[in-house]
Amino acid sequence: MSDILSISELNLAKKRVFIRCDFNVPMDEFLNITDDRRIRSAIPTIRYCLDNGCSVVLASHLGRPKSGFEEKFSLKGVAKRLSRLLDRDVIFANDVIGSDAQNKASALKSGEILMLENLRFEKGETKNDEILAGELAKFGEIYINDAFGVCHRAHASVEAITKFYDDEHKAAGFLLQKEINFAQNLIKKPTRPFVAVVGGSKVSGKLQALHNLLPRVDKLIIGGGMAFTFLKSLGENIGNSLLEEELIDDAREILKKGKELGVKIYLPVDVVAAQSFSAESAVKYVTVQEIPSGWMGLDIGPASVRLFKEVLADAQTVWWNGPMGVFEMDKFSKGSIKMSHAIVETHATTVVGGGDTADVVERAGDADEMTFISTGGGASLELIEGKELPGIKPLRKASE
């Protein structure tokens, strides 16, 4: 971890600091924030800057606006929530690099906070545009990246902006350091037995991570929609369940590689099946060998939960990424929720990655019991895959 430039090593005294945060929070149709975990996660870095007499400019994206300003993607609500959490004013700019932002930034005094409007209202943000990055860099003498959730994206406020700062004036915030730490320790020195639990709908999104995890884990549990491609590769009849036909050979290859490495791989033994994904559809609990034709598995069944619980019993480290079923609908969420309970009961070091998985853990009431809940899905997967992330690379110390 010492190879990453850290905020605690910088001389911040009374400087203006630009912090790239990840305030990409879920909202309901009335634009109320339904989960403010990402906002709360940014507070230690913000407070540290304020304690050093800094003035602070915060920048983030929210959602994926198509072209320019859209009310539902405004960060105004985030500024209000942050103000409440910090118990101090957060000044809000109605644009990103326009006159409102510039005027408010130049009037900023020590101890004051300004939040810019959604970075993605500027089309240059996602294009990693250096002109936009240069404009953003004018907002701070110091650049801090605390947005792990976007570190796998080469965007203007994440990568291009770092070119405007030398090593004395840029660093990772506390949240980013914590994220990198957990991911690196997981890969390099997990306490064993190390069990990876991988779910979610698609094998394609997790293929590289599975290949990278196999030599490092002791056991691998595969659930969610992606399990059906593995079951199909073993010759099971999976009915209408989700299948990535073109990845059957890859699935077979992973199972074979697991066997060669002595890694035990566990797949669901039963499922909750329905004819369609709807609240009205009748459901059946069936073994994976007996999914009726025209029916699809939408969650793991009770026997799978029992099996996976036994597999986890002696775990010392658990990494979980991806739900066990289509948890958005109550009747198909039980497997994921029971999995969450089972992981918490292990008393192992438990690391949860990915937005959906974090939602499951929150819903199960287990969030406080997990060792660490990562704020980034794609980013944590890419770190596990062993990739260098565009947002982290410029924050590595030059000498190493």
Curated annotation (Swiss-Prot):
Reactions mediated catalytically: (2R)-3-phosphoglycerate + ATP = (2R)-3-phospho-glyceroyl phosphate + ADP
MF (Gene Ontology): ADP binding; ATP binding; phosphoglycerate kinase activity
Top-rank taxon: Bacteria
Principal location listed in the UniProt entry: cytoplasm
InterPro entries on file: Phosphoglycerate_kinase, Phosphoglycerate_kinase_CS, Phosphoglycerate_kinase_N, Phosphoglycerate_kinase_sf
EC number: 2.7.2.3
Top-level enzyme category: transferase
PROSITE patterns: PGLYCERATE_KINASE (PS00111)
Gene Ontology terms: biological process: gluconeogenesis; glycolytic process
Record has Kinase as a keyword: yes
PANTHER family in the record: PHOSPHOGLYCERATE KINASE (PTHR11406), PHOSPHOGLYCERATE KINASE 1, CHLOROPLASTIC-RELATED (PTHR11406:SF23)
HAMAP family: Phosphoglyc_kinase (MF_00145)
Record protein name field: Phosphoglycerate kinase
Organism field: Campylobacter curvus (strain 525.92)
GN (gene name): pgk
